[in-house]
């Protein structure tokens, strides 16, 4: 199965399934002498791991990462970094009733059509469980970026029709919704409780931001920085749309409104472009927004077919997120970090 490696110089290859024994990743191209320990990675994994609140899946995975190669005496050696996480809370029996059925809205049907076989236990490789290794790799990328003064943060900016204003960045990691607005917590709680009571799910918008970048990252024309970001974000489970800067709002704008004017004293006067012009970073904040679809794993019956092509009805049992976008925040941060560290290393190689 191809398509499991991301990056050009700083590469990440992942493997593992939702109900398999373990998840693993190989990170190659990491510079040497970067201080790194398991605790550095665990900090990011703890933000993504399931079972932390009543508003996400109740599957409880400690997601304890082990570094098996590429680090010696607390520093990277420049050789491939191997990471592994053991799965510990699989309940495969929850999926026994759908082993011959395709869950509507899931990858069951397409995986079976492509490979002639599928791991029906929690979606196998198509499960968002795989993203734990992306977050682990992203933690390493973040350490490198921090050395260059680059910071990445994300937040949930909309759940369903509830739009959430950005008020306090420091509050993002102090609540289970990754929102930047303390006053919006009760509304988020009520919404998720209502959705869960209905046996349904809801979509979300996640905004991810990178600050402290230099101008000049990105390689026109097919390796534009915004194209690389969109490619990375669209590889995340349940993401159905990605926009940069003002995104789709620019459709209703005039050129006189949208263009980011520049002055000698103040620099850029606005950032409608989201920090990228012509596929190259401007040095402003990079801003991307992701639309997460509502998960198809719900308790309401849905029409589908089985492997023989017969009509059937599916009710997805098991433990699932009522809103997958909530836990998508650290995943989006990780993917942006992987894109930027790769582009940074590529740009350095050009200049050297």
From Swiss-Prot:
Reduced FMN (FMNH(2)). The keyword Glycoprotein does not apply. NADP(+) binds at residue 48. Its cofactor is FMNH2. It is an enzyme of class 4 (lyase). Signal peptide: none annotated. GO terms for molecular function: chorismate synthase activity; FMN binding. Keywords: Amino-acid biosynthesis, Aromatic amino acid biosynthesis, FAD, Flavoprotein, FMN, Lyase, NADP. Pathway: Metabolic intermediate biosynthesis; chorismate biosynthesis; chorismate from D-erythrose 4-phosphate and phosphoenolpyruvate: step 7/7. The keyword NADP applies. GO terms for cellular component: cytosol. CDD domains: Chorismate_synthase. HAMAP family: Chorismate_synth. NCBIfam families: aroC, PRK05382.1. Homotetramer. This reaction introduces a second double bond into the aromatic ring system. This is Chorismate synthase. It comes from Francisella tularensis subsp. tularensis (strain SCHU S4 / Schu 4). The gene is aroC.
